């Protein structure tokens, strides 16, 4: 019987952990969501946590494309800001480093 040792693991090649919204960020987003639901504008939401981006999608109805997407991309922290609000057509409505100001679209 022969034993094979696994090749060394290069930490730089390890997949990065997924990006997620932190509790204070979700509190801001859900506060806005609650106000818009009460106004009858929004009805549903979805959250996606991927490797490079976390997305909070807002829907008018469950079975349609999102009206808005609130994205968090930490790699853009030093450049354009890691938060962005994107419209239904894919246009970036607002981008910045502070989520509270970005949500004032």
List each model region and its residues.
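Mixed-charge, glycine-accented linear interaction segment located at domain edges/termini
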Residues: 84-105
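Negatively charged, low-complexity tracts enriched in Asp/Glu with abundant Ser/Thr
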Residues: 4-54
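Residue-level detector of beta-strand face positions
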Residues: 57-59, 84
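Short, charged/polar surface micro-motifs in flexible loops or helix N-caps
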Residues: 51-54, 61-66
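Short, surface-exposed beta-strand/loop "edge" segments at domain boundaries and coil↔beta transitions
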Residues: 63-68, 91-95
